[in-house]
């Protein structure tokens, strides 16, 4: 007899509910949000052949890959569609939501969502962190330009090392403004150093991936673009 399992995940605990093919509740409980204790309870109360459903969320990739690694049949469900179905419940609790997910798995009224590999998520995190620092350097350079323009000092349209040198040259004759601008410029330099660290990590990742190496043979394709495209497809 097939069993169906619903998981309602929060940061610390996960509510688990097991139902049979008739919709009868067989077991319901709570355990720590970790693949090992969750898989142990599912195997004990539902069996390794049970169909398990979990909503999309920030912790979903880690849990799904961990549970699949334990041999469980786990489906990731679109949270927006699940929310519409669970809104019909009178009492909204984690345990009831887990039972609702189990019933959705039983009826088959769900849309499975692809869960990208952990390697793809690592590439995405790397590119996201780099993008944040690039945005911060842009905002800092714009602020430096704005402060200098207020006092008639124009660094021009240079970027990178050229911008750095122009600002330093302008500050030599304006010590009062240097008190404000130099700390900003020092922070800007540190951010660029960290961006260079990320760039090196991206290139290492590209060299280790045969697909990325192949894409890099296309003219004008950069390591950042190749990593973004290959990571989004996994």
How should these model regions be labeled?
Residues 1-234:
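A detector of single, family-specific signature residues
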């Amino acid at each position: 007899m097939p069993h169906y399992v619903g998981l309602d995940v929060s940061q610390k605990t996960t509510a688990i509910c097991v139902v049979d093919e008739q919709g009868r509740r067989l077991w319901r409980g709570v355990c720590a949000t970790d693949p090992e204790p969750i898989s142990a309870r599912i195997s004990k109360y539902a069996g390794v052949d049970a169909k398990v459903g979990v909503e999309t969320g920030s912790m979903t990739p880690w849990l799904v890959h961990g549970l699949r690694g334990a041999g469980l049949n786990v489906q990731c469900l679109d949270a927006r569609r699940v929310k519409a179905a669970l809104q019909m419940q009178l009492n909204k609790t984690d345990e009831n939501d887990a039972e609702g997910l189990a019933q959705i798995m039983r009826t088959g009224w769900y849309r499975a969502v692809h869960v990208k590999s952990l390697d793809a998520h690592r590439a995405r995190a790397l590119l996201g962190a780099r993008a944040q620092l690039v945005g911060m350097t842009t905002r800092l350079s714009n602020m430096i330009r704005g402060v200098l323009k207020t006092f008639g000092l124009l660094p021009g349209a240079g970027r990178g090392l050229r911008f750095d040198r122009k600002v330093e040259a302008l500050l030599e004759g304006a010590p009062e403004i240097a008190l404000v601008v130099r700390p900003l410029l020092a922070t800007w330099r540190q951010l660029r150093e960290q961006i260079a660290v990320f760039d090196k990590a991206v290139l290492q990742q590209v060299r280790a991936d045969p697909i990325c190496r192949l894409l890099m043979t296309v003219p004008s394709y950069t390591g950042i673009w190749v990593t973004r495209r290959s990571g989004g497809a996994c």
